[in-house]
Amino acid sequence: MANAIIETAKERFAQSHQSLSREYASIRAGRANASLLDRIQVDYYGAPTPLNQLASITVPEARVLLISPFDKSSIKDIERALNASDLGITPANDGSVIRLVIPALTEETRKELAKEVKKVGENAKIAIRNIRRDAMDDAKKQEKAKEITEDELKTLEKDIQKATDDAIKEIDRMTAEKEKELLSV
């Protein structure tokens, strides 16, 4: 039963890491990356639809994203959604495809994005600490219900803390890696 608490916590830690990884992938680092467009929703026949379901997104060059709509009539809707997004990139529509040229990041923009990365990383650490708190509470409930002894509780708390420390180290590593990617010219 005690192992179930740790396993559940570790699974939740892994989910937090995956979520953070997706979040970092959507922060542009001056290079074209199809995941930059993951959050873009297009108003397609009145329904918000993810862009990647309406078009293929390719990276023909280091700083260019090429969006090829499956349905050519949706090109105006896609262009409208890209203009309304917070990407800060103006789409170039040639009638059959849309090109997004990713501008080089200025030093100021890099620093702003690095701050954003730190903030996202800190939020992920808070999520990890909340998971730890839930696991510790579950362990204490088991001890109160006499399912585990006090010694087992102490061991379990140490194991939970070690798993938490490992999860936070991984977040720190991911954050440092993304900051390095952003700040390297």
Curated annotation (Swiss-Prot):
GO cellular component, one term: cytoplasm
InterPro entries listed in its UniProt record: Ribosome_recyc_fac, Ribosome_recyc_fac_dom, RRF_sf
Keywords: Cytoplasm, Protein biosynthesis
rRNA-binding found in the keyword field: no
Gene Ontology BP annotations: translational termination
Pfam families in the record: RRF (PF01765)
Claim: Protein biosynthesis is one of the keywords in the record: yes
Membrane-crossing residue ranges in chain numbering: none
Entry's Gene Ontology molecular function annotations: ribosomal large subunit binding
Subcellular location per the Swiss-Prot or TrEMBL entry: Cytoplasm
Function description: Responsible for the release of ribosomes from messenger RNA at the termination of protein biosynthesis. May increase the efficiency of translation by recycling ribosomes from one round of translation to another.
Family: Belongs to the RRF family.
Protein name: Ribosome-recycling factor
Organism name: Streptococcus pyogenes serotype M1
Gene: frr
